[in-house]
Amino acid sequence: MYRDRGTVNSRPEVVDRKRINDALERPSPSTSRQVNGKGKGTVTAATTTANLIGKQQSNNINHRDSRSASLSKNNTVSDDESDTDSEESDVSGSDGEDTSWISWFCNLRGNEFFCEVDDDYIQDDFNLCGLSSLVPYYEYALDLILDVESSQGEMFTEEQNELIESAAEMLYGLIHARYILTSKGLAAMLDKYKNYDFGRCPRVYCCGQPCLPVGQSDLPRSSTVKIYCPKCEDIYYPRSKYQGNIDGAYFGTTFPHLFLMTYGHLKPAKATQNYVQRVFGFKLHKP
């Protein structure tokens, strides 16, 4: 809607490409994305910058490293090369035009903790109660999440488009925190838990126990997401540097405990073995 998602041309003008990348550099790593051809109202930040440079470049440049691998084949590239590019893609699927914003967002590198929220849940205003006061550009962010075209899209500046992108990610995260407390949301997170998508406990005596994402606060921008081990009942930082930047409010403080109450058979026995400190083979006395 506000940015084109999908195809780009991959031409070898290295100098121009570098100039565009430099122009698109921003301090926030998770507030923008490249979307294609669903007839969205505004032009991407990359396209705007390319037009300013002139007619030398007609290609849109992806300005986030985790998203650059989703480029589709150039008309002049061989079939073998295009197959290689598709294998390296961060986002599955061969047709970017058919990818919804929600699917695109959940398949980004670092967003493995997120499940896809049903459109019906998002379209129910009751489920979004109170979020409009927390998220700037709320209506436009909601339209972006639902892939709804905006008649006012062309009125926004490049900076405003980026703010809407950031607002959409924040809004989806807050909706996600509510959705995973529903029966459908818990079931979706159960599949991820069984696939170890949330990682394993780094504690040696937990023997690779699967973990669950948890926030230390339900308020956005308070802390980043952590992983909770149901065996030692402690929290740890995610191993991935990408996941370590996700807001903990997008999962909340309730989820892992409600999850284990719902699926009680998955709750492991509490860890009883602890590390023993020794010096020359003798246990240290604990005062």
From Swiss-Prot:
Record organism: Arabidopsis thaliana
Family: Belongs to the casein kinase 2 subunit beta family.
Description of how the protein assembles with itself and partners: Heterotetramer of two catalytic alpha subunits and two regulatory beta subunits. Interacts with CCA1. Interacts with LHY.
Function of the molecule: Plays a complex role in regulating the basal catalytic activity of the alpha subunit. The tetrameric holoenzyme CK2, composed of two alpha and two beta subunits, phosphorylates the transcription factor GBFl, resulting in stimulation of its DNA binding activity. CK2 phosphorylates the transcription factor PIF1 after an exposure to light, resulting in a proteasome-dependent degradation of PIF1 and promotion of photomorphogenesis. CK2 phosphorylates translation initiation factors. May participate in the regulation of the initiation of translation. Stimulates the binding of CCA1 to promoters.
Sequence segments annotated as region (Disordered): 1-97
InterPro entries, per database record: Casein_kin_II_reg-sub_N (IPR016149), Casein_kinase_II_beta-like (IPR035991), Casein_kinase_II_reg-sub (IPR000704)
SMART domains documented for this protein: CK_II_beta (SM01085)
GO cellular component, one term: cytosol
Biased composition (Acidic residues): 78-97
Matching Pfam families: CK_II_beta
Protein name stated in the entry: Casein kinase II subunit beta-1
Ranges annotated as biased composition (Low complexity): 41-50
MF terms in GO: protein kinase regulator activity
Residues that span the membrane, as ranges: none
PROSITE patterns: CK2_BETA
Residue ranges, compositional bias (Basic and acidic residues): 13-25
BP terms from Gene Ontology: protein phosphorylation; regulation of protein serine/threonine kinase activity
PTM notes: Phosphorylated by alpha subunit.
Alphabetized Gene3D superfamilies for the sequence: 2.20.25.20, protein kinase ck2 holoenzyme, chain C, domain 1 (1.10.1820.10)
Keywords: Cytoplasm, Nucleus, Phosphoprotein
Coarse class of the protein's main subcellular location: cytoplasm
Localization of this protein: Cytoplasm, Cytosol; Nucleus
UniProt entry tagged with the keyword Cytoplasm: yes
